[in-house]
Amino acid sequence: VAFNEYGQTICKYSDSGSNLYVYKEEAVKLIVKVLETVVSDLKINFSDISALGCGLAGVSDLNSRDLLLKEFDRLKIVEKSIILSDTESAYQLLCPTGQGILVSVGTGIVCLGRDKDGKSFKVAGRGYDKGDAGSGYWIGKEAIKKLYLNQNILLIDEDMKQIYDCVKKKFNVDDLHALEEMFNDQNNMVFKVAALAENILDYAEKNNDIALSIIQEGTRIVAEYVVCLIDEMEYTNKEAVIAGNGTIIKNDFYRKCLNDALQFDISNLHWIFSDICCAYSSGIIAAQCQKINVSVNDIIKHIN
């Protein structure tokens, strides 16, 4: 998104595949392409940009981050730019006082908390390929794994067949052998695997026992992450307000399963979400670094 010093949104652009850890150089190219498109659509020059905030997944990939900074330097906007994690961007938006708990579940997962003294605590967030459970990618991967483990009943068991048909359609393959070849030939299957989560959640809600078992296992582990975070923060209140971010945690059924898994540790749990996207938060943070005073309220006022 692009907005002016009054908080008026002047341009929006959407694309996918900007995770620096997953897509690396391709992500950098995409980000630059998006910036060039926005500049072109607004009929401005890069020198007209007062501040640029990028809230990105995978910023721990230092090589890709450095490559992106070099591109910003080439475009002569590096001194006006700030790169931060998408989780930090979401936290700044959803926990504006600098205190609270954020559970972000999309393709990946991370639980972030800060106490009244500003001390940070983090659970999970190691990466989609490093054991983080309960995320969109994990849900998709578990569904595919169950197909391979139950090949002898794929066409007999109705629940398994429903998932099998979905996977074949999503990946445009005829059988598991073709799917395996696709995984061997293509490096970046993360987005496609994570996209399965939406279907698995839908099937689980409609009483597909296989899908339900995946969601219940995933949310049970996420509940353990949340409890671990609360313990580390020494939070003893049985009532909690947790900020949520990401497509998976915004799913009502996923959140119901997570609430069920947390009911003995948090008896009264409230979720809060933002009506505006986290891209605004990244831009606001960048603006503040350039001493430009734009607030979330300014953005919301002009959206409404």
Predicted regions and their residues:
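Phosphate-binding/catalytic loop of phosphoryl-transfer enzymes
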Residues: 60-158, 302-303
